[in-house]
């Protein structure tokens, strides 16, 4: 049997609680069957290599780091305030990082109709 370690990527949606899953696979009538089996210990460095910013136990940024991922996060640190995180095509009202979060906040000068008007190319037809 071949065992494959399923490395859990550290995301808030799928928190890591000190255990992982080993997938045991085998062949049954030429079909590969995978059976999950819970384990509690991981090889040293297995989780550390998944995301260098993330503490594998708490699934939060490591000590001394600011963020794990996001458009305003690079090398585990928030990008400087004023860094463009979302460039617009027509109106020049780009979205900028704040320096205190990894999210890319919407430019407050944009109106709701601007977002609707230029967000995507329309395809299809109008029925009247």
From Swiss-Prot:
Disulfide bonds join 53-76, 67-73, 72-97, 85-104. Heterodimer with subunit beta; disulfide-linked. GO terms for cellular component: extracellular region. Its main location: secreted. Residues 21-46, 112-128 form a propeptide. It is found in: Secreted. The keyword Ribonucleoprotein does not apply. GO terms for molecular function: toxin activity. It comes from the Eukaryota. The lineage of its organism: Eukaryota, Metazoa, Chordata, Craniata, Vertebrata. It comes from Macrovipera lebetinus (Levantine viper). Residues 1-20 form the signal peptide. This is Disintegrin lebein-2-alpha. Negative results: has no interaction with the collagen-binding alpha-1/beta-1 (ITGA1/ITGB1) and alpha-2/beta-1 (ITGA2/ITGB1) integrins. The keyword Ribonucleoprotein does not apply.
């Amino acid at each position: 049997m071949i065992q494959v370690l399923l490395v859990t990527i550290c995301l808030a949606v799928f928190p890591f609680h000190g255990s992982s899953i080993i997938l045991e696979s085998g062949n049954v009538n030429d079909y590969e069957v995978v059976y999950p089996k819970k384990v509690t210990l991981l090889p040293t460095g297995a989780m550390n290599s998944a995301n260098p910013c993330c503490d594998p136990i708490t699934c939060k940024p490591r000590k001394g780091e600011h963020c794990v991922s996001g458009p305003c996060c690079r090398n585990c640190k928030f990008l400087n305030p004023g860094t463009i995180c979302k460039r617009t095509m027509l109106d020049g009202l780009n979205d900028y990082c704040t320096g205190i979060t990894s999210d890319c906040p919407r430019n407050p000068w944009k109106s709701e109709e601007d977002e609707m008007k230029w967000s995507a190319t329309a395809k299809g037809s109008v029925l009247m």
